[in-house]
């Protein structure tokens, strides 16, 4: 997967748009990219898909498809919108266990895994324990540790390990596969 022309939640957008990102991909021999169509809280998944098609149309230099990002799994999203998009070919979606604008709680994750199982979709999970990161970050800030090297210290291996193992446990509960993305530590494997 890749991230193209994607808002980040702090009013900035990823540096590569569909033209520059797909040009780079083509130069490297890649013929298809799958960036994310990210739902905004309070918005619909269909709005996200429509927005990303507008961003790509006339700019993408190679083929593209979209993974979805689900941030607001309302009953309507779970019962109608997500199943309809899966039926139309959007068969993978990503969820987050971290980042305030994106993270879901375990119950929401279970609800989405149930849809994935029923509709035969793939769930990708960015697994980090948001509360541990927030707690560690607060301690760093209290001590004035703000240099880039302290970023890693607010995301110790145990933080990723716990969330990864929890995500796997939730998938086992529903007997549905998940793809853990952005694994950085041996303990999470």
For each of these PLM feature ranges, what is it?
Residues 2-16, 37-39, 65-78, 97-98, ...:
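Active-site mouth loops of central-metabolism enzymes
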Residues 45-63, 67, 111-125:
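Alpha-helix-loop-beta-strand connector modules within alpha/beta enzyme cores
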Residues 2-59:
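Metal-associated gating/positioning segment near the N- to mid-region
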Residues 14-22, 74-85, 166:
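Short, acidic/polar
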Residues 80-189:
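Histidine/acidic residue-rich metal-binding segments in metalloenzymes
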Residues 1-7, 123-128:
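Histidine-centered catalytic micro-motifs
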Residues 1, 25, 29, 64, ...:
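Divalent metal-coordination and catalytic microenvironments
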Residues 2, 30-35, 61, 65, ...:
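Gly-rich Lys/Arg/Thr-decorated short loops/hinges at beta-loop-alpha junctions or inter-strand turns
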């Amino acid at each position: 997967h890749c991230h193209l022309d994607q808002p980040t939640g702090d009013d900035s957008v990823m540096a590569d748009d569909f033209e520059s990102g797909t040009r780079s991909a083509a130069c490297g021999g890649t013929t298809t990219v799958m960036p994310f169509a990210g739902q905004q809280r309070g918005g619909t998944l269909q709005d996200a898909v429509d927005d990303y098609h507008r961003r790509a149309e006339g700019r993408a230099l190679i083929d593209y498809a979209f993974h979805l990002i689900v941030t607001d799994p309302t009953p309507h999203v779970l019962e109608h919108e997500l199943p309809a998009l899966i039926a139309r070919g959007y068969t993978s979606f990503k969820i987050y266990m971290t980042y305030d604008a994106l993270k879901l709680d375990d119950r929401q994750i279970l609800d989405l895994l149930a849809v994935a199982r029923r509709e035969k979709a793939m769930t990708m999970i960015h697994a980090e324990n948001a509360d541990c990161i927030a707690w560690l970050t607060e301690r760093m800030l209290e001590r004035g540790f703000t240099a880039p090297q302290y970023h890693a210290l607010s995301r110790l291996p145990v933080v990723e390990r716990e969330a990864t193992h929890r995500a796997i446990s939730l998938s086992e509960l529903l007997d549905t596969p998940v793809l853990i993305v952005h694994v950085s530590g041996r303990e999470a494997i």
